[in-house]
Amino acid sequence: MFKGSIVAIVTPFKNGAVDEEKLRELVEFQIENGTDAIVPCGTTGESSTLDYEEHDRVIEIVVEQVKKRVPVIAGTGSNSTKEAIEMTSHAKTLGADGALLVTPYYNKPTQEGLFLHYKAVADAVALPQILYNVPGRTGVNLLPETVARLAEHKNIVAIKEATGSLQQASEIIDLCGDKIDVFSGDDFITFPMMACGAKGVISVTANIMPKEVAALVDAFFAGKMEEARQWHLKLLKISNAMFIESNPVPVKTAVALMGKCSAEVRLPLAPLAEANKVKLVAIMKEYGLI
């Protein structure tokens, strides 16, 4: 259903508010450079510090601007199942083509709790849903066996696997077969994950290098393995630089250095440390981005 290079797009701010004009420009930048789908209100979009009105508005703007040219997959996850259902339902009403739901964080549900949470959302909202497993941020790991149970649900179509573990990704692909699509949640591991059967990436790096991330994925699916491998190696340094501090601080700084929006992030996120900014600038210059 979804495939290729999918960007987890940043949410630009200006004087504390969502910068709607810059958000529209960022959407155009992505589509013009070959991005296959757009995820607003993910981790990279600072969903955790958007209020409900802003969250809905960001999704609405992206849907409006995209005009059905590529799928829009709205971030609608929550650690409250009731809230996740409401947000996913509203995303559908706004015209989103799918939803990305992070595992419930902080309250640390069991595997059965995770299963029941996702099943409840999928039962309640007839919209294609992507599970999102990122234990480094949530404190809970959605195990392959649980993913396999959820893959039986018609509305659960994919998983963004961001453990950084090829073993876990491979186990999901092996257990689920064609019942669910797997996407890399870490740019540095996209190529090897696709070699194991992943269908693409939900990317941070694509915020600044959409054409190149798309080239990696497109080369792989065109059977041009050596070209894809070379793109993987070429993008490795810049992809790692996106995590010199907590995402999305480095990538938003990078987008700002390219003149595309402000570097403003919301507390408790802080601006990129000056020493890390110096490193980031040097790496971006190597890539000809600034």
Swiss-Prot record:
Similarity annotation: Belongs to the DapA family.
EC number: 4.3.3.7
Protein name according to UniProt: 4-hydroxy-tetrahydrodipicolinate synthase
Annotated site location: Part of a proton relay during catalysis: 43, 106
Gene assigned in the entry: dapA
Highest taxon, organism lineage: Bacteria
InterPro entries: Aldolase_TIM, DapA, DapA-like, Schiff_base-form_aldolases_AS, Schiff_base-form_aldolases_CS
Enzyme class: lyase
Cellular compartment(s): Cytoplasm
